[in-house]
Amino acid sequence: LDKLDIHNLKMLQERGGAVRKMILRAELPEDLQKDIILAYKELSSSYSSENTDVAVRSSATAEDLPNASFAGQQETFLNIREEQNVLEAVKKCFASLFTNRAIVYRQEMGFDHLKVGLSAGIQKMVRSDLASSGVMFSCDTESGFGDVVLINASYGLGENVVLGRVEPDQYYVFETTLKKGFS
């Protein structure tokens, strides 16, 4: 991505696409594949299922910083089931570190593309039609105040909150109050 002109759409698409293809064509290390499959089997077993539906979510090291949010820059894959599909979704998460949108955002914010790491989390999909889902932050995103947990939630998939498709309910949980036993 050296000397990439992010305002040259053709160059951005070619280079971003080339990096994503390299990641998707590569094999995950065997020990990582085994660990993912074992964890997926254990998760499925804990729900008395052979192949439970999961969300494969990305989490980058540069997300939710005081001066850069990175929210929504990488991909999440929902309702994934079966071992091979989980492994492919993990690779797609890794490749999503190099979507055109993510490349542009990092470059505009002054981040080195190769110094941002990414992990993939695998979570059980829940019945969002029977409850709510959303996004939780470990501080107030407006002020940076660190003694609260901020939760944005709505009925349906949490992705609807992340993508701004719904107007979520907003909850502030004051940690000091909880620690004193008040609820």
Indicate where each model-derived feature is located.
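N-terminal beta-alpha lobe that positions the nucleotide/phosphoryl donor
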Residues: 1-121
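Extended active-site and interfacial segments that coordinate phosphate-rich ligands
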Residues: 70-104, 128-183
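Conserved functional hotspots at enzyme active or ligand-binding sites that engage polyanionic ligands
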Residues: 125
